[in-house]
From Swiss-Prot:
HAMAP family: Ribosomal_uS8_B. This is Small ribosomal subunit protein uS8c. Part of the 30S ribosomal subunit. It is found in: Plastid, Chloroplast. GO terms for biological process: translation. Belongs to the universal ribosomal protein uS8 family. One of the primary rRNA binding proteins, it binds directly to 16S rRNA central domain where it helps coordinate assembly of the platform of the 30S subunit. GO terms for cellular component: chloroplast; ribonucleoprotein complex; ribosome. Transmembrane segments: none annotated. Its main location: plastid. GO terms for molecular function: rRNA binding; structural constituent of ribosome.
Length: 132
């Protein structure tokens, strides 16, 4: 049983990237599915699908690589807000990751958004992770 499903997801993606795996399997929750949606919209993964039923639902994420060297599109992932120390930011304090080259994933009242979309909509929320 994993307490922090977001950290588990980020770790699985990081390890699969380092091993140059094409597909990574993560447990499916509402939050991991929303984060996968953001990764897909921002072009960090090719696609994802939900398989299984009931308590055994899994997300299959197709990772994206570039060039003949198969360099990962995702350079790094960093968990920010965690169960032991929640991190919140209002719309004025939303972080910029690497000066705009990366994204911050924010959980807002209107769902999980990137920092740019949250800033555009004037929303703050919990800063889940950074991806670049």
């Amino acid at each position: 049983m994993v307490n922090d499903t977001i950290a588990d997801m980020l770790t699985r993606v990081r390890n699969a990237n380092l091993a140059r795996h094409q597909i990574v399997q993560v447990p499916s929750t509402k939050m991991t599915k929303n984060i996968a949606d953001v990764l897909l919209e921002e072009g960090f993964i090719q696609n994802f699908e939900e398989v299984g039923d009931g308590i055994n639902k899994q997300l299959l994420l197709s990772l994206k690589y570039k060039g003949k060297e198969r360099e990962p599109v995702i350079t790094a992932l960093k968990r920010i807000s965690r169960p032991g120390l929640r991190v919140y930011a209002n719309r004025k304090e939303l972080p910029r990751v690497l000066g705009g080259l990366g994204i911050a994933v924010i959980s807002t009242s209107r769902g999980v958004l990137t920092d740019n979309k949250a800033r555009h909509q004037g929303l703050g929320g919990e800063v889940l992770c950074y991806i670049w």
